[in-house]
A protein has these predicted regions:
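Leucine-rich solenoid repeat scaffolds
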Residues: 233, 244-249, 296-324
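Helix-turn-helix repeat elements of alpha-solenoid scaffolds
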Residues: 28-35, 59, 63-66, 106-109, ...
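Ankyrin repeat domain, specifically the short helix-to-loop turn at the C-terminus of the second helix
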Residues: 36-48, 68-77, 106-118, 155-166, ...
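Ankyrin-repeat boundary/"N-cap" motif
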Residues: 8-29, 48-59, 78-98, 120-146, ...
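Surface-exposed loop/turn motifs in large extracellular/passenger domains
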Residues: 99-106, 144-157, 181-189
Length: 326
């Protein structure tokens, strides 16, 4: 299994390669719903694209095309290619422009039956930990759940990969999904041995370049404690993760509506980014300024909401400005 590094797609792409580029998560600031929608529209206007190559068929989750490509070339399921230089399973798992859950599962089953590696992955910009097929399914990350959503077939696709041999200790998944209190990913991974699984293929190949298990769990514990994710801490403890010494942060005081952090962002900026509508409304009622501009990006709370595709938060802010003219 060669180590893959995320590549920048070339500019002179074929239509099928362009579709793949639009459809998949890149884990950069180009990830956004309009790009995924553009891929869907492109496929709708040219339904023959999945027939061009297996990578496009996988990104489209077209079970007939995937089966046809695999029948034509039994080794195709393991071949790197397309604009990202990935194996087909990665295009399927990172696509956000694919078909129904049943179609996705059918494609995954065909690829795995044809020899696809359930632990396929790549090193994002050459860094560890790897972004695996599971990472793509579970989704989310630093750009937020609207820009980097979970796969439409999550959790069924993740369950299939795990049953077919994907290693449950997926460090990048644990990082990407730690920012919000939902624990569905942990429950599924623990059910497949996350707590005590032996070394995975990526750990064995990358060695000291990977975080140790102790470092991985410390990151999870520290974030959960700092953000008062008590259900997560209880879940970790129930599966034998050592939580001794963890100090849960004190309940937060009501944020000062006018205070700014080191980059000039207000509590209203952060509430807009998170899409926290109740907090957004409380801050506005307490005198928060929807026109406040932070210094790092030069954005207002409305700009932050728009960038995170928190459309409801953007609407609340726009309505407030309209109803409270200066």
């Amino acid at each position: 299994m060669p180590i893959l590094t995320l590549v920048t797609p070339p500019q002179d792409l074929s239509a099928a390669d362009h579709f793949c580029t639009l459809a998949v998560l890149h884990y950069d600031d180009t990830d956004a719903p309009p790009r995924f929608a553009a891929a869907t529209a492109m496929l709708r206007s040219d339904p023959a694209l999945p027939g061009v190559h297996l990578w496009a068929a996988a990104a489209a989750a077209d079970p007939d095309a995937v089966a046809a490509h695999c029948a034509h070339d039994a080794a195709a399921a393991s071949l790197r290619g397309g604009p990202m230089d990935w194996q087909p399973l990665l295009y399927l798992c990172y696509s956000r422009s694919c078909g129904s859950v049943n179609d996705v599962l059918a494609c995954a089953t065909t690829l795995l039956d044809a020899g696809a590696d359930p632990d396929a992955g790549f090193l994002w910009q050459g860094m560890t930990p790897p972004f695996t097929a599971l990472t793509g399914v579970f989704g989310e990350g630093e750009q937020g759940p609207r820009r980097q959503p979970r796969h439409a077939a999550d959790p069924a696709l993740a369950e299939l990969l795990l049953r077919r041999g994907a290693h449950p200790v997926d460090q990048q998944t644990l990082y990407n999904r730690m920012f919000r209190p939902d624990n569905a990913h942990l429950e599924l991974l623990f059910g497949h041995g996350l707590a005590d699984a032996g070394p995975g293929p990526w750990e064995m190949r990358l060695g000291h370049r990977m975080e140790t298990r102790a470092q991985m769990w410390r990151r999870q514990l520290d974030w959960a404690a700092a953000h008062r994710f008590t259900d997560r801490l209880q879940l970790l403890e129930s599966f034998g993760i050592d939580t001794s010494g963890v100090q849960i942060a004190a309940p937060p005081t009501p944020p000062d509506p006018l205070a700014r952090d080191e980059s000039g962002a207000t509590a209203l900026h952060h509430a807009a980014w998170a899409g926290d509508l109740p907090l957004l409304r409380r801050l506005l009622a307490a005198g928060a300024d929807p026109a406040a501009v932070e210094s790092r990006f030069g954005g207002t709370p409305g700009d932050w909401a728009a960038h995170a595709y928190q459309t409801e938060a953007a609407e609340v802010l726009a309505d407030w400005v309209r109803e409270h003219p200066r």
